[in-house]
Amino acid sequence: SPRSIVGVDASVKRLGNYRILREVGRGGMGVVYEALQETLDRRVALKVLPPHAMLDAQFVSRFRIEAQAAARLQHPNIVPVIGLGEDRGIHYYTMRFIEGEGLDRLLDRTRAFLDGDSVPGNGAVTSPLLATELPDRLPGSGVSSGSEPSVVSGVSDAPERAARVDRKTYFRNVARIGLQAADALAYAHAQGVLHRDVKPSNLILDDGGRIWIADFGLCRDETAEGLTQAGDLVGTLHYLAPECFRGVHDVRSDVYGLGLTLYELLTARPARDGSTRAALARQIAEESPPRIRSQTADVPRDLATIVEKATATNPMRRYATADSMAKDLRAFLEGRPISARTPSLGYLLAASVRRHKALAATLITALLAVILLTVLYVHDVK
């Protein structure tokens, strides 16, 4: 049955022309519902301010500014903001409702996959991440805004599929996810918008293999003044970059959150294991995550290098932009050298062989033939 708005009179089951269907998620900046936009007969994700915030004029102002900032983002990998309103003192905005699954929900199956090279038959829908090879490029791929998978995504109704990917394909799928997300973040950053809470639950993978960045409701519009205090800690602690504890947050902090998300997909383990907030904060500020290949030995070296560069404790050692991270992920997928590794002759030759496998095989065959003919010739001469 439809649910009322939390903290508001129980009779409130609609806002404007939206009928509330169910709560699907909540975070520090609001509660998200699945709702029906009755005028257009379509489902949307509707995000409202938490009750305690509706009396705070500054909070409301920030909420509206952030919704407007997110609405400016028009990219195929960002959940679009499609409406902003207020009804009976309740402030809300609406987003496209994405059918898919948050990466946080995939981590348990990812762990089973990496540990046993299979997905347990638990009746859950198998994600494209584990069931098929994702395309390197999607039609109209770009960037877009959104919210937690639990916030704007529904459980896919696609039929259950057995996992068919091998480990090599899985690792490439992780790189493809990272590339889509990095492209999207680069677009948002170019518009002056930071996400500030990049994490697995804010990345939704739909049935077509497209990743959607969700919950720009914690974003900071770089063109807005005075709405976020310099020392505010906005975001989920586990995925906060070390500099955020000093009140510093820039594009490299979003790169860090994406890097940690990819780290977990590659290792099926959290980057840090602090049991308390204080211990976790200390680890984030002082310690680098364990090396990826010490956790999952067969992760391709270049992919591990990219993710480790993105998650460097010192922001000066990270990718300076999401675009530079995207370029390295694209280079990895295309078999080209990545900028994060020192280009030794052996590395460049190996990359060239990976990229031109057919030509390399032909040349090696020809070389072996020449060697064989030379040996036979010398033998005949003797």
Language model features with spans:
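Alpha-helical transmembrane signal-anchor helices
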Residues: 351-382
